[in-house]
Structures are given as C-alpha cells and as structure tokens.
Amino acid sequence: EFAPGDLMLITDHINLIVMGGLSPLRGQNIDSLGPRFPDMMNAYDDVLRDIAVRISNDLDFELRQGVYASLAGPNFETPADLRFLKVIGVDAVGMSTVPEVIVARHAGIRVLGVSGISNKANLDGNTPTSHDEVIEAGRVIVPKLVNMIRGVLYNI
C-alpha cells in the first residue's frame, strides 16, 4: 500500500541484522554509556511520533506508519525475502536505521524513526529494482522529510 516517495513513521522494527549476530553493542559494555541490555520495548518515542504526525498534517502530506525491517545489504531483496518480510508484518525494509536506533536507545536517547519509501516491493520477481528509481524517489522524499524534521525540532 506504500508508494515510492512516501514517508513512513517507524512504529517498531524487526532487527534481522542483529538476529544474524551483528549487534552494534557486541563486545565489552561501557557502563557509563548505557546498560548492557537496553530495553527496546518503546524504541520509537511516542511523543516525538505524535509531533511528527501533527506536523505532517500541518504540511498537508500523508505520513504513513508501519514496521521497519533492517537487512545487512548492500543488495536489494529477493522476491522470497520480500514475501517472508510481508508474512512477518514488515511494511518497509532497508539497510540501515536499526543499528543506530539500538545505539541511541543504549545511550538513553529518544528516537524518532522515519523511513523514505524508495521503491515498491516486487513479490513476483518480474520487475527488478533500479538504483535510478531509488534516487528519483529520494528527490520526492527529501523536501517533505526536511520540512517535517524542522517542524518536529521547533516543537520539542
């Protein structure tokens, strides 16, 4: 239901990178930076999300909401990857964001997660994703994202 050029407010994530053993918190913990096992139950701050929704309404664009999955990349997903992600409840997928969220939450930093939808999932494998398509969607996404983030920053 999402389209290239949409912005999606991340309400939760599925961390497939860390499930594969690549946690940004591996190694010895520095207690002064945060707890060994940070709580990820509310990784994305409700207050910041509410502000983002209000700002996007003020700016007259639809801010989608959904669950983000993080994969290691750097490659686009296979049709089987995409079908699996759909079954487990993923709305958008990317190669970043989640490791940064984990580190931020480890440090006690509030997080607002927003994902730019750059291409449509091709579940049947008939239409390959092109890098040019992703770049073009970015041109649509950037002005909306910049204006929304400015609005959020002015309201916190």
Regions found by a protein language model. Give the residues of each.
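Glycine-rich phosphate- or other oxyanion-binding loops that anchor nucleotides, phosphorylated ligands
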Residues: E1-G125, H131-I156
